[in-house]
Amino acid sequence: MEKEIKDHKSVGIVEKQFFTCAQVPSPLILENGAKLGPITIAYETYGNLSARKDNAILINHAFSGDSHVAGHYATDGPKEKPGWWDFLVGPGKGIDTDKYFIICSNILGSCNGTTGPASKNSETGEAYALDFPMVTIGDMVATQKLLIDHLGIPKLLAVIGGSVGGMQTLEWAIRYPEMMHSVIPIATTMRHSALAIAFNEIARQAIMTDPHWNRGKYYGQAHPDTGLAVARMVGHVTYLSDEAMRRKFGRNLQEKENLSYGFDADFQVESYLRYQGNKFVHRFDANSLLYITKASDYFDIVERISTSGPETELTAPQQKYLVISYSSDWLYPTYQARDLVKALKRSGRNVSFSEIESDCGHDAFLIPDDRLEQLMRGFLAGIYTGIAEI
């Protein structure tokens, strides 16, 4: 495995780290007024922080992602996949760990090391379940800010994220404009559309109508795996595109020559979705899906951007944006990215925009693509050179 990692120009063996914050008597005050603490944050870092502490980049992961952006864990087997953006983050890559210090944390409410509904409630000794307070994208970002402060980083070179990670990235730009030189939102939106909310509601209902959900109190017993698998199947369709599904599956049959005239998986696309759903239940928590999809549905910064003027929070003169969309993304279509660009320009922002032609749908930003790598490399190099001259 070590030779494979070296040949792949990977960051190599990495380790998940943990930081506990918002402890009594200073819990985090959430947007809805609830208090939460202590909070444990799982995170990973790659590269080295410069002496000037001016090369730090925060990457925000998507809905079901985690802090494992690149590299391998020491416990990985030879067939284990590297981090989810390994093609983009590493030595000499688009986000170059020989030049930049990369940070990624698991979001609040998730289930991959950061406090969420599956975590133990210190007051009861049991899992929070639905006693976990409703959190927003803003609350996730406020938690990340505590981590960045803990790491002693006064200002980030860039904040980058795709999909739900792009929402976090935009929230960072609004909440803490003085904390970053640049912002790169990818395949994202200023607010969830009715279409996106509708798909999330179907996913939530799939879980909440599973007889094993038990109003969220399923820890230590049978989990709502069927509902979670169906929720993932629904979500996965939104991550693809008509073109991608026609190219990959068409109407091809799954390991058979004739239709079964029953309810087996006759078509390859049926088998694929069942596989994706069943795989998901082994790595994700159903309650976390409920909380994160709801946080995404609540996300809406249109008014906050549109009311920003020359004296307000989005107008730090040195802050630059690179907005990226994908032509076949029907979850967050390019028109939504263009709306974001227009809103940012109206508020006096320095904005670059690129639509990448792809038939891979919403998840295209997670697929190796030289065009994305070149965009990242060039934009970040320009930002870093600019601040080095200050």
UniProtKB/Swiss-Prot annotation:
<comment type="pathway">
    <text>Amino-acid biosynthesis; L-methionine biosynthesis via de novo pathway; O-acetyl-L-homoserine from L-homoserine: step 1/1.</text>
</comment>
<dbReference type="InterPro" id="IPR008220">
    <property type="entry name" value="HAT_MetX-like"/>
</dbReference>
<dbReference type="GO" id="GO:0009092">
    <property type="term" value="P:homoserine metabolic process"/>
</dbReference>
<comment type="function">
    <text>Transfers an acetyl group from acetyl-CoA to L-homoserine, forming acetyl-L-homoserine.</text>
</comment>
<keyword id="KW-0486">Methionine biosynthesis</keyword>
<feature type="active site">
    <location>
        <position position="362"/>
    </location>
</feature>
<dbReference type="Pfam" id="PF00561">
    <property type="entry name" value="Abhydrolase_1"/>
</dbReference>
<keyword id="KW-0808">Transferase</keyword>
<dbReference type="GO" id="GO:0004414">
    <property type="term" value="F:homoserine O-acetyltransferase activity"/>
</dbReference>
<feature type="active site">
    <location>
        <position position="329"/>
    </location>
</feature>
<dbReference type="InterPro" id="IPR000073">
    <property type="entry name" value="AB_hydrolase_1"/>
</dbReference>
<keyword id="KW-0012">Acyltransferase</keyword>
<protein>
    <recommendedName>
        <fullName>Homoserine O-acetyltransferase</fullName>
        <ecNumber>2.3.1.31</ecNumber>
    </recommendedName>
</protein>
<dbReference type="InterPro" id="IPR029058">
    <property type="entry name" value="AB_hydrolase_fold"/>
</dbReference>
<keyword id="KW-0028">Amino-acid biosynthesis</keyword>
<comment type="similarity">
    <text>Belongs to the AB hydrolase superfamily. MetX family.</text>
</comment>
<dbReference type="GO" id="GO:0009086">
    <property type="term" value="P:methionine biosynthetic process"/>
</dbReference>
<comment type="subunit">
    <text>Homodimer.</text>
</comment>
<feature type="active site" description="Nucleophile">
    <location>
        <position position="163"/>
    </location>
</feature>
<keyword id="KW-0963">Cytoplasm</keyword>
<feature type="binding site">
    <location>
        <position position="232"/>
    </location>
    <ligand>
        <name>substrate</name>
    </ligand>
</feature>
<feature type="binding site">
    <location>
        <position position="363"/>
    </location>
    <ligand>
        <name>substrate</name>
    </ligand>
</feature>
<dbReference type="GO" id="GO:0005737">
    <property type="term" value="C:cytoplasm"/>
</dbReference>
<feature type="domain" description="AB hydrolase-1">
    <location>
        <begin position="55"/>
        <end position="366"/>
    </location>
</feature>
